[in-house]
Amino acid sequence: MNEFPKNDENDESDESDEDTAKDRVVVVTGAGTGIGRETARAFAAEGARVLAVGRRPEPLAETAGAYPSLIEPLAADITGPEAPEAVVAAALERFGQLDVLINNAGIVRSGQGVGGYDRTGIEALLATNLVAPVLLGQAALPALGDSRGVIVNVSTAVGQRGWPSNAVYAASKAALETVTRSWAVELAPRGIRVAAVAPGAIDTPIGDHSGYGPEQRAAVRKWQIEHTPLGRTGRPEEVAWAITQLASPRASFVTGVVLSVDGGALVG
C-alpha cells in the first residue's frame, strides 16, 4: 500500500511567506464593494500590496481604510480607451512590480429578453464584462511575464448554464471563461497562470445598479436560493477566499480552471 511520506519532525507546518501573498503586488478591479472589496482586503491580510480600482472614490477609500498601508485606491473607468495601460502603469509606478491581476469588475442589467435588447445595452455589458478584462490582461502581460504572475477572472455560474431573459450577460461571462482557458494555454510558456471563479448567488450590491426594482431583486434572490443546494446565498468573503487560493503560489500547477463557488447550484 502506498503511503504519504511522513514529515520530518523538524518541519514547520505553518505557511512560509513564499506560500502567501506577502510582498506581492495585486491589482483588483471593481474593488469598491462586494467581492472586489473583500478580495482586496483578503490579499492585504496576507501582506500583499493592493491597487484597488473602481469608478467611485468614496467606496474605494472605504475598502482601503481596512489596510491603509497596503491598499491604495485608484479611481478609474476600466472601459476607457486608455484605462488598461493607465492601471498597469499606476501599479508599476506605485509598487514597482505586478504579480496578480484580478479582473472582478462587472455589470448586470435588468431582464432583457429576446426583443428587448438594444445596441447601447449590449455594448455596455460587453465593454465591462469582456473587453475591459481582455485589454487589461493584455496590458499587464509584460509585467506578469517578469513576475511569472497570475490572472484570475471573475465569471458567474450563469456563464455555464445560461440565463433566460439575460442572455447577453450570461454570454459575456461565458466568453470570459473561454478567454481564461485559451490564455491558460497561450501564456503557460511565459510562466503566467490564468484561472477563473464562477460565483453563484452572492450577497453583493451589484443588483442595486441593475435596473431591477426591489420586488424583482427579491424574486430573483428567492429563485436563486431555491436552486442552490446549500440553501443560502454566498458571502463575498467566500469568493474572495477562492480567488486568493487560485492566485497563491501553492496553486502553481493550477491553470485553465473555472472554479464554481455557487453552493452547488451548477450541479444541483
Regions found by a protein language model. Give the residues of each.
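Short C-terminal tail/terminal secondary-structure segment
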Residues: 2-4, 108-111, 161, 244, ...
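Conserved glycine-rich cofactor-binding loop
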Residues: 32-34
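C-terminal substrate-recognition "lid" of short-chain dehydrogenase/reductases
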Residues: 95-96, 134, 143-145, 232-261, ...
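Substrate-binding pocket helix/loop in short-chain dehydrogenase/reductase
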Residues: 112-114, 118-126, 224
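Active-site helix of classical SDR
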Residues: 137, 172, 180
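Alpha-helical segment proximal to the catalytic Tyr-Lys
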Residues: 142, 185-189, 252
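Residue(s) in the substrate-gating loop at a strand-loop-helix junction
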Residues: 156
